[in-house]
UniProtKB/Swiss-Prot annotation:
Catalytic activity: L-seryl-[protein] + ATP = O-phospho-L-seryl-[protein] + ADP + H(+); L-threonyl-[protein] + ATP = O-phospho-L-threonyl-[protein] + ADP + H(+)
GO molecular function, one term: ATP binding
Phosphothreonine modified-residue sites: T307, T312
Name of the protein this chain belongs to: Probable receptor-like serine/threonine-protein kinase At4g34500
Modified residues (Phosphotyrosine): Y220, Y320
Keywords: ATP-binding, Cell membrane, Kinase, Membrane, Nucleotide-binding, Phosphoprotein, Serine/threonine-protein kinase, Transferase, Transmembrane, Transmembrane helix
Organism: Arabidopsis thaliana (Mouse-ear cress)
Topology of this chain in the membrane: Single-pass membrane protein
One Pfam family per UniProt: PK_Tyr_Ser-Thr
Residue sites binding ATP per the record: I151, G152, E153, G154, G155, Y156, G157, V158, V159, K173
Top-level taxonomy: Eukaryota, Viridiplantae, Streptophyta, Embryophyta, Tracheophyta
Segments crossing the lipid bilayer: 25-45
Length: 437
C-alpha cells in the first residue's frame, strides 16, 4: 500500500519535458532563436537599403549634395575650372541656386526654392550663390569646431573661424537643429541673400549640407573686427574708440545695407532682426548687416505679411509686436532704436538702470522733449559732436520710431537725412527768409 502510494506521488510531481528537456528551457531556446532570426532579417533589410542608396548616388552624380528639404527640389554640383594665380588647375564645386517664387508665394514665407546647375562660368556667377563645402573640409578648417575657433554664439547656431589650406578665412555658422530650425534658417538665408552682393551686407560664400549627420552650415565672408554690440557695451575703457564720426559712419553703412534690401531687390527683403550684435565691423569701421535667419520676402503688390512675431526684445516695432503684421517699416523702427543705441551707448532695455531709464526709447523721447538732447550722448565719446549734427541724428531717431508706421521714412530717405548737412533745419531756414522779406 505504502509503495504504490509513493509511486503515485512521484509520477504526479514529474515536470513536463520535450525530448528529455525541460519545457521552459525549450521555450527559452526557441525565443532566442526567433529573436536572432528577426535581427538577421532587420540587418539584411538595412544593408540592402544602404546599398541601394549608394547605387542611386553613383548613378545620378558622384558629387551630389543631400537634399535640404521638400522645397529644394534638386541640387547638383558642377565642376568649374578655376583659373587664378592662387589656384591654377583646381576644380571647384559650384552650386547654382535659382529662386522661383511668385510674389504671393514669397510673402507666405519662402514657399519654393529650386536649384539648378550650369557649366558656364558666367551664368554660374550670375545665377549662383556660392560653393559647396564638405563637412570634412569645414572640420579641418575649424580644427574640429574647437572652442578656440568659436567667434560667436546665438539662439540659432554657433559661429566658428575657418582657416582654409589656401590661406583664405571664412566664418562658418553651424545651425542648431532645434525642431527643424536649422532646415528653416538654411532655406531662408539662401533665398534672402543667396544672390545678394552689397558692401554693407555680409556675403554668403557657400554652404554645407550633410544629411547623414543632420548638419546644416552656412559659410560667410570673415569680418575681422567683431560686432557693434561688443564695441558699444564691451569693456573698451573710459574712452570709446568709436568716435562720433565713426558711429555715424556705422549708422549710414547699416542704413545703406537695409535700403538695398528694401528698395534694391524684388521681392524686397525684410530683415526682421536689426540689432547691434548683427552689425559686423571691419578694421576700417565699415558696417555689414548679418544674420538673415528671420528674414521675410515681401512682394511689390503686398503691403505686409502676417507672421509669428519674432525678433529681439527692445528692437521690435509696436505694431508688429501687437498684430504680427510685418513690412519694411518694422526694420525702420528697429534701425531707429539701433541709432539711439549708437548715440547713447545704452542697451534698448537695461534693468540695471532706474525705472524711468530702463526702456531706451521712452527715456530718449523724454530727454529730447525736455530739451536735454545733449545729455543723451554716450559719456565715452571724448569729443562731443557739433550741435547741428546731434540735432540731425536725434531727429532721425524720432522719425524712425514714430508710432504711426506710415509716417516713418524709407531707408533711402534716412541715408539722405544722415548725410545732408542742412536737412533738419530747412523749414526753419525758409521761415527766417520769409520773415526777412
Amino acid at each position: 500500500m505504502s509503495d504504490s502510494g509513493g509511486g503515485s506521488h512521484k509520477s504526479s510531481t514529474t515536470k513536463p519535458s520535450v525530448f528529455g528537456l525541460n519545457l521552459y528551457l525549450v521555450i527559452a531556446i526557441c525565443s532566442v532563436f526567433i529573436l536572432l532570426i528577426s535581427l538577421l532579417i532587420f540587418l539584411f533589410v538595412c544593408l540592402n537599403r544602404v546599398s541601394r542608396a549608394r547605387r542611386m548616388r553613383v548613378k545620378h552624380s558622384s558629387g551630389s549634395i543631400p537634399l535640404v528639404s521638400k522645397e529644394i527640389s534638386e541640387i547638383k554640383t558642377v565642376g568649374k575650372f578655376i583659373n587664378s594665380d592662387d589656384s591654377k588647375g583646381k576644380i571647384g564645386n559650384e552650386v547654382v541656386v535659382v529662386v522661383s517664387a511668385t510674389s504671393k508665394e514669397a510673402t507666405s514665407g519662402f514657399d519654393t526654392l529650386s536649384v539648378a546647375s550650369s557649366g558656364d562660368v558666367g551664368t554660374s556667377e550670375a545665377m549662383g550663390w556660392g560653393k559647396w563645402y564638405s563637412l570634412k573640409d569645414l572640420e579641418i578648417a575649424t580644427r574640429g569646431f574647437s572652442d578656440d575657433n568659436m567667434i560667436g554664439e546665438g539662439g540659432y547656431g554657433v559661429v566658428y573661424r575657418a582657416d582654409f589650406s589656401d590661406g583664405s578665412v571664412a566664418a562658418v555658422k553651424n545651425l542648431l537643429n532645434n525642431k527643424g530650425q536649422a532646415e528653416k534658417e538654411f532655406k531662408v538665408e539662401v533665398e534672402a541673400i543667396g544672390k545678394v552682393r552689397h558692401k554693407n551686407l555680409v556675403g554668403l560664400m557657400g554652404y554645407c549640407a550633410d544629411s547623414a549627420q543632420s548638419q546644416r552650415m552656412l559659410v560667410y565672408e570673415y569680418i575681422d573686427n567683431g560686432n557693434l554690440e561688443q564695441w558699444l557695451h564691451g569693456d573698451v575703457g573710459p574712452v570709446s574708440p568709436l568716435t562720433w564720426d565713426i558711429r555715424m559712419k556705422i549708422a549710414i553703412g547699416t542704413a545703406k545695407g537695409l535700403a538695398y534690401l528694401h528698395e534694391g531687390l524684388e521681392p524686397k527683403v525684410v530683415h526682421r532682426d536689426v540689432k547691434s550684435s548683427n552689425i559686423l565691423l571691419d578694421k576700417k569701421w565699415n558696417a555689414k548687416v548679418s544674420d538673415f535667419g528671420l528674414a521675410k520676402l515681401l512682394g511689390s503688390e503686398t503691403s505686409y505679411v502676417t507672421t509669428r512675431v519674432m525678433g529681439t526684445f527692445g528692437y521690435v516695432s509696436p505694431e508688429y509686436a501687437s498684430t504680427g503684421m510685418l513690412n519694411e517699416c518694422s526694420d525702420v523702427y528697429s534701425f531707429g532704436v539701433l541709432l539711439m543705441e549708437i548715440i547713447t551707448g545704452r542697451s534698448p532695455v537695461d534693468y540695471s538702470r532706474p525705472p524711468g531709464e530702463m526702456n531706451l526709447v521712452d527715456w530718449f523721447k523724454g530727454m529730447v522733449a525736455s530739451r536735454r538732447g545733449e545729455e543723451v550722448i554716450d559719456p565715452k565719446i571724448k569729443t562731443s559732436p557739433p550741435p547741428r549734427a546731434l540735432k540731425r541724428a536725434l531727429l532721425v531717431c524720432l522719425r524712425c520710431i514714430d508710432l504711426d508706421s506710415s509716417k516713418r521714412p524709407k531707408m533711402g530717405q534716412i541715408i539722405h537725412m544722415l548725410e545732408a548737412e542742412d536737412f533738419p533745419f530747412r523749414p526753419e531756414h525758409r521761415s527766417n527768409q520769409e520773415r526777412s522779406k
